[in-house]
Curated annotation (Swiss-Prot):
GO terms for biological process: DNA-templated transcription. DNA-dependent RNA polymerase (RNAP) catalyzes the transcription of DNA into RNA using the four ribonucleoside triphosphates as substrates. Binds 1 zinc ion. This is DNA-directed RNA polymerase subunit Rpo12. It comes from Sulfolobus acidocaldarius (strain ATCC 33909 / DSM 639 / JCM 8929 / NBRC 15157 / NCIMB 11770).
Amino acid sequence: MAKYRCGKCWKELDDDQLKTLPGVRCPYCGYRIIYMVRKPTVKIVKAI
């Protein structure tokens, strides 16, 4: 299950919440720009 974040009110959304409205809109404020939240990953770089 992917997590999304609204570009205006910054509330986190699930896939199920996005499917409730037609199109891609925030169910809270109606804003149409949604960002996908990625898990924080750590990249280990070997020192020279």
